[in-house]
Design a protein with these regions (language model features):
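Alpha-solenoid helical repeat scaffolds
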Residues: 53-54, 89-90
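Alpha-helix N-cap/helix-start positions at coil->helix boundaries
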Residues: 7-11, 23, 38-39, 74-75, ...
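Amphipathic alpha-helical scaffolding segments comprising HEAT/armadillo-like alpha-solenoid repeats
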Residues: 20-34, 56-68, 93-106
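Structural signature of alpha-helical solenoid repeat scaffolds
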Residues: 49-50, 85, 123-124
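Solenoid-like repeat scaffolds
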Residues: 2-3, 34-37, 70-73, 105-109
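A contiguous pocket-lining binding segment that forms or flanks enzyme active sites
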Residues: 102-124
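N-terminal "cap/leader" segments of large eukaryotic alpha-helical scaffolds
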Residues: 1-31
Length: 124
């Protein structure tokens, strides 16, 4: 079972750590995405991003990613957008079809960084 401390202290090895993430770790990682501590939030984001490249484990939390994409906070919007992008590959239920216009609207987000991250995430 992962801990906040382990993730933040081992951020340089997060891609390898992501390979070991199991379903029990997801709730902690999703909670950490809302952390006010940048290193915690970023560690959780990276772990989930790398896990999503190889596994559909996060796809069952699709609705929480969409909720983040709709958040007032630009950090949360960016996290939601980038993780949605990583999980579209697992979208057998075609949930992305329901949000594609909203997703693409963030190419013109009021925060430039969110716009940039949306455009960059389209390649996934």
């Amino acid at each position: 079972m992962l801990s906040r401390e382990f993730l933040t202290e081992n951020i340089d090895h997060i891609e390898k750590i992501a390979d070991e993430i199991d379903a029990e770790d997801l709730s902690l990682l999703l909670e950490m995405l809302s952390s006010k501590i940048d290193l915690e939030r970023y560690s959780a984001f990276l772990a989930l991003k790398f896990k999503s490249e190889k596994s559909d484990m996060l796809y069952s939390h699709w609705d929480s990613l969409v909720k983040r994409m709709r958040d007032e906070n630009s950090y949360q919007r960016s996290i939601g957008i980038m993780l949605i992008s990583e999980n579209v590959r697992w979208d057998k239920q075609e949930k992305f079809d329901d949000i594609v216009d909203e997703f693409l609207s963030h190419c013109e987000d009021r925060k430039f960084i969110t716009s940039r991250q949306t455009v960059q995430s389209i390649k996934n």
